[in-house]
Amino acid sequence: NILENPGWYTSYTPYQPERSQGTLQTLWVYSSCLSQLTGFEAINASLYERSTCLAESLNVCLRLHRKGTTVLVSESIFPGDKEVVETLIRETDVLVEWVPADDKTGLTSFDEFKSKAERLSNDKLLAGIIFPQVNSLGLLENVDALTDLSTSLKVPSVAIFDPMLLATGGLKPPSRFGSEGQGVDIIVGEGQHLAIGPNYGGPGLG
């Protein structure tokens, strides 16, 4: 029974040798399935939840693009994710500039995203851009245009996706975002609803 498999309940590998191999097998199966679903070769298993994973992706962007100091993030992400990011970057050198959603459409304003990205890039401050595939209002963002923007500016791109919607909704996998199908560099998602019961909001599987 997948739902009762304790391997889904935690990302930690137990120290007991008689359990380790089964847990590692479970994590390998999970990573392999997500790899097939997203088209990405490397899938971790896992961080605490999507919000923490998103915050870590900021650090990855800064390490991949060391001259940059600022990551552009769409404000149409889930409010809880935004709160966690702002909490974890407090008292650090990580800088985030939020791009608001259009009041009429509910989508991230691409023109404003592009304007801010080009300004930061010209000042050699841009380290990466982050955007959701499906935003907090349930709307599909223009992932191809945003991916093309990061490609043209030569900075890492991070896409926040929902594996359940990707598996059942016919959405384009993040490995094929962009007008030329070049894909994003990093993906962030939440896997709790793949196999774990709600349990008052946790545990997560980022």
Language-model segments: which ranges?
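Conserved N-terminal alpha-helix of the aminotransferase class I/II PLP-enzyme fold
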Residues: 1-53
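Conserved PLP-enzyme active-site core in the AAT-like
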Residues: 52-206
